[in-house]
A protein has these predicted regions:
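Sec-dependent N-terminal signal peptides
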Residues: 3-18
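Polar/charged, Gly/Pro-rich intrinsically disordered segments
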Residues: 20-66, 92-133, 217
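Start-of-domain marker
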Residues: 24-48, 70-74, 136, 142-146, ...
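N-terminal targeting sequences that direct proteins away from the cytosol to non-cytosolic compartments
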Residues: 49-50, 120-170, 219, 241-243, ...
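A short acidic-to-branched-hydrophobic micro-motif
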Residues: 59-71, 163-196
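Short, non-transmembrane amphipathic alpha-helical segments
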Residues: 69-92
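Short, exposed beta-strand-loop hairpins at the edges of beta-sheets
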Residues: 89-92, 99-114, 239, 252, ...
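Signature of long, low-cysteine stretches enriched in small and polar/charged residues
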Residues: 124, 199-252
């Protein structure tokens, strides 16, 4: 199976030179693969029937012998081979799913579907707790959380950014700002129930972007403190380069402070996958002082 996969992957050079493949690109790629490999016999009871594309899914079809039996861990093996070859990352970044179909005498014997998000090698493990207590930018806030393993931990380079975790084009930042006054948790819950206030805040929060879109928002609790969770996307420019970015943010009202847990990255499949990690980090947040009794 590994040999078959590596042979097929030789025809994927087109992907390496494209930042983001459209459905039309994927269709053309499938036609190329089909033309090159159709009818190829691998000599082990498996021959190539063809390849085609459905939307963002590449479908590989094979003819197998009557006594062919799919390996017990065939899906795991296929994903492992895609990762080892380096093409899993390309599929993942371009949001390309793959499906493998095996036929005997035009009857489907086995079908394995692999979604693009299953092809990420991202690490979703968290490290040991770190605390911002005593940090000059923390403004007296006592907060601790678990950073993502394998990410670079740096000090914030702007006045209110306490710390940031970095991985390629992605970041998770801890930002602390002064609020206008002290608010109790009940007062904040009442404030966040005001739809006009929330909409105005979201409009202000996305104003630094061109063509901003608020993708979703909801009221949640972060370690018992009422918070506004929202995701937005839009366009921005840096040193002449235009890009579409996404941000996921938790705005936590903590007494007389506002804490922003802000995650950002390019609008791609990687950001979508990392949202799970961002949720895990935020769910690890603890405000220790509320338990000192």
């Amino acid at each position: 199976m590994r040999f078959i996969l590596l042979i097929i992957l030789l025809f994927f050079n087109l992907i390496s030179y494209s930042q983001s493949l459209s459905e039309s690109d994927i269709k053309i790629l499938a036609q190329r693969i089909n033309k090159e490999l159709q009818g190829m016999d691998f000599g082990n009871g498996i021959a190539v029937k063809g390849c085609y594309a459905i939307g963002r899914t590449l479908v590989y079809q094979y003819l197998v012998s009557e006594d062919w039996v799919a390996p017990e861990n065939i899906k795991t093996d296929l994903i492992e081979n895609l990762n080892k070859s380096g093409y899993a990352e390309t599929y993942f970044n371009n949001d390309i799913s793959v499906e493998y179909q095996y036929f005997f005498e035009n009857r489907l014997r086995e079908k394995i579907s692999i979604k693009s998000y299953e092809l990420t090698n991202l690490n979703f493990n968290l490290g040991e707790y770190i605390s911002i207590v005593g940090h000059p930018k923390a403004k007296g806030v006592n907060l601790k959380l678990k950073p993502p393993m394998g990410w670079q931990i740096e000090e914030g380079d702007r006045p209110n950014i306490v710390q940031k975790f970095l991985f390629k084009n992605n970041n998770y930042m801890i930002i602390v700002k002064d609020n206008v006054m002290f608010f109790s948790r009940n007062e904040i819950r009442e404030l966040l129930s005001d739809e006009e206030y929330v909409n105005q805040f979201l409009s202000d929060a996305s104003s630094f972007l061109s063509n901003p879109q608020i993708l979703n928002h909801r009221i949640v609790s972060v370690d018992k403190y009422p918070s506004l969770e929202f995701t937005l996307k839009g366009e921005m420019e840096r040193v002449g380069i235009k890009m579409t970015i996404k941000q996921k943010c938790w705005m936590i009202f903590f007494e007389d402070k506002i804490i922003y847990l802000q995650c950002g990255g390019l609008d791609n499949n990687e950001f979508t996958a990392l949202e799970k990690l961002y949720d895990l980090i935020t769910n690890s947040v603890i405000f220790p002082e509320q338990y000192d009794y």
